[in-house]
Every structure is written in structure tokens, then in C-alpha cells.
Design a protein with these regions (language model features):
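Short amphipathic alpha-helical segments and their helix-coil junctions
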Residues: 9-16, 71-89
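Short acidic, glycine/proline-enriched loop segments that cap or flank alpha-helices
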Residues: 22, 45-49, 66-71, 85-94
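Amphipathic alpha-helical binding modules
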Residues: 81-113
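Core of compact, soluble alpha-helical bundle domains
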Residues: 2-60, 110
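Amphipathic alpha-helical interaction segments
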Residues: 25, 29, 33, 77, ...
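Strongly charged, low-complexity linkers/loops
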Residues: 50-58, 66-82
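Short, residue-level hotspots on alpha-helical faces of the histone-fold
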Residues: 33, 60, 64, 100-104
């Protein structure tokens, strides 16, 4: 089994465990889109307590990748909602799941064809 398949299966299990309403297809495509960062321990997760990282998510992912045309408050609210959905005490907020939830929140799942 390839490392990518192992990551996808792990993220699917975590998604199920956390009760996230994400399809296997969306998780798979979000994970594939994040190679090679999913193999780097620090880059694999999102820290909801790091405002600089959340600003990067907002600018690079929401605005640039997804093309979200919303004010900062709306994007901040969506990011906070995802942080809470993944569990505030959860130290393993995997970037693939985080991005998939944000894409779903803004109705932009089609970014992952």
C-alpha cells in the first residue's frame, strides 16, 4: 500500500471518528492536492491557536485557491467553525480535512475535480 493511500485511509478514519460530514471522494482529492506537505509533520496539521497560520489559510487557501469573495469576518467565522468541528482540544487538525471542510463550508467542493 502506498503512503498516499495510507494517509487517505487514516484521514477517512479520523473524519468518521470526529463525525465530520465529508465524502471519501472529497477527502481523497483534498489529500492528493496537498502532496508533499502531508508527509511533513508540521505542515500536515493546522494550528487553530496560531493566528499567523490562520491568516495564511485565509489568504492562500480561501482567497487564492478557492476564490472566496467574502469579507475577512466571514472567512474568520468559517475558519473558527472548522476549528470547533475538528475539536478545540484536538492537536491533530489534519490540513486535508481542514481544507475539505472549508471547501464544503463555502460550497467550493468542485475545486477538487
Amino acid at each position: 500500500m502506498s503512503k498516499l493511500v495510507e494517509k487517505i485511509e487514516h484521514y477517512m478514519a479520523v473524519s468518521k471518528e470526529l463525525g465530520l460530514d465529508l465524502s471519501e471522494d472529497l477527502i481523497s482529492k483534498a489529500t492528493e492536492d496537498l502532496v508533499p506537505s502531508i508527509y511533513q509533520q508540521d505542515a500536515e496539521t493546522v494550528s487553530c491557536s496560531d493566528s499567523a497560520e490562520l491568516d495564511t489559510v485565509k489568504k492562500n487557501f480561501l482567497a487564492n485557491k478557492l476564490g472566496v469573495d467574502a469579507d475577512d469576518a466571514t472567512m474568520d467565522t468559517a475558519i473558527q467553525k472548522v476549528c470547533e468541528a475538528m475539536g478545540t482540544s484536538n492537536r491533530h487538525k489534519y490540513r486535508a480535512l481542514f481544507y475539505a471542510l472549508l471547501a464544503k463550508e463555502f460550497g467550493k467542493e468542485s475545486i477538487y475535480p
